Amino acid sequence: MIKDFNPGDFIGKKPTKIYAFGGIQEVGKNMYGIEYDDEIIIIDCGIKFASDDLLGINGIIPSFEHLIENQSKVKALFITHGHEDHIGGVPYLLKQVDIPVIYAPRIAASLILKKVNEHKDAKLNKIVTFDDFSEFQTKHFKIDFYRVNHSIPDAFGICVQTPNGNIVQSGDYRFDFAAGSEMLDVHKVVKIAERNVHVFMSESTNAEVPGFSQSEKLIYRNIQKILKEARGRVILTTFASNITRINEIIEIALNNKRKICLLGKSMDVNVNISRKIGLMAIDSNDIVEVRDIKNYPDRNILILCTGSQGEEAAALNTMARGKHNWVSLKSTDTIIMSSNPIPGNYAAVENLLNELSKFGVAIYENSSQLKLHASGHATQQELQLMLNLMFPKYLIPIHGEFKMMRTIKNIANECGIKSEDVALLSNGQVMYLIDEELYYSNEIINADPIYIESHNSSPDLARIIKQRQILSRDGMFAVIVVFDKNNNIIGIPTLITRGCFFALDSNPLMTKIAHSVKRTLESVIQSKKFNSHEQLTKELKRVCKETVSYFIWKNKNRNPLISTVLSWI
């Protein structure tokens, strides 16, 4: 049973601390810390993609405040695999925290190097690749790995032996027993379990999905059938990060005498990195530039492109709008959607499919009748299998929203793990592991989300986002007041409204606001309560905003962004 930590019971004992910077009660920005005495090791540093209401924001990363404050303790960053929600925050981390060494699988290491090169002020000291047999040791920690099956090659779970017990972080995984060399290493998992797993930090993304997930082999067979029967060009879109599937699709295409055309930056980058490190064996002659596809018969072309989520600027959407410079869709084309819409993207994907349909193309989507996509995350029976193999003393669900975490708690109960031995946490909440027992502590680290705009990250962006949301919803209202050198208001304040309401249709209200603002400001000036011009200006702006806000809310039920400009001549 997980108990509350009582310092009086552990005088002279040093706890192993476990916490999440991000990745708990959410899907994205995965980042976890394990700390003992004078050492901190980090597992993953991901990004979370911004929702549509976060206007102008490219992504969200965890706060690194705890690491900045404890810089001398930071010893290493370990990466489970190369997906964006696990490595996308690394360049921003390297700008703020001195990381002595990053340990990563081959493809993740290559992707990180490329990211760092795009961020000139990110300082990378050292990056070391690891595999199934690697072991690393710090003063207090011993770390090794086990291979897992996921939608990207070189994916791993991480085992950390600490002075207070053994912690296993699952990484992202699934069981696909037809995956060959990329199959989850059950034998290694059993060996790790024999050491005793005291805390298992398990992903929970697909905890609500019953049964076992479909094998990728079924997906490949269905895609192969479509490719074989297609008489024209085949345009296939999937997640550019799903390198395992992309590799198989390329092999299927080559076996059907089709050249490969890569469209979209992330697709091009991921394929070329995979080729460079030997994960894809594709001859350069089998890849054609988009401007050259016209030189080949349509039946000999496969276009692999981005845009499976209906992204506006992605290659497939550009084609659907008839705006692509090199690819014009025609009725003989076949479109394969080898993906599912992520929650929040359903409308964008439906709109994309409607636009594609206008060209008369054949469209194949993933469905229960035709499987063209399988998730890379463990479903209920796969989670049960892993929990039975690991059989941890304590479980901390991660990598999922709260309802997913609660569901894996129920699954754990069915596997013999008691509810009181499962910790449903929040980001920033610190757990203590002492003598192989887990405790709730009162310690909290800062886990506020940090927003990214272009390549810049700042806590101040949260305030800017709020302003943008107000602008998009209620518009902007500006008040310009001109004073003479004796603080007398010259004329009537000028009012400007944008996106709030039509000024021409609201002349009486605009007149009322202008005169009320003038009277209110004059009463402030006449009170003579202020010792400095700065104090007076601050108070004038405050009462001006209050006055305008009152009238607009009362008459228009709007709450615009109010800007006041005070000028003295």
Curated annotation (Swiss-Prot):
It is an enzyme of class 3 (hydrolase). GO terms for molecular function: 5'-3' RNA exonuclease activity; RNA binding; RNA endonuclease activity; zinc ion binding. Its EC number is 3.1.-.-. The keyword Magnesium does not apply. Its cofactor is Zn(2+). It comes from the Bacteria. Zn(2+) 1 binds at residues 81, 83, 150, 172. Belongs to the metallo-beta-lactamase superfamily. RNA-metabolizing metallo-beta-lactamase-like family. Bacterial RNase J subfamily. Homodimer, may be a subunit of the RNA degradosome. PANTHER family: RIBONUCLEASE J. This is Ribonuclease J. It comes from Mycoplasma genitalium (strain ATCC 33530 / DSM 19775 / NCTC 10195 / G37). The lineage of its organism: Bacteria, Bacillati, Mycoplasmatota, Mycoplasmoidales, Mycoplasmoidaceae. The gene is rnj.
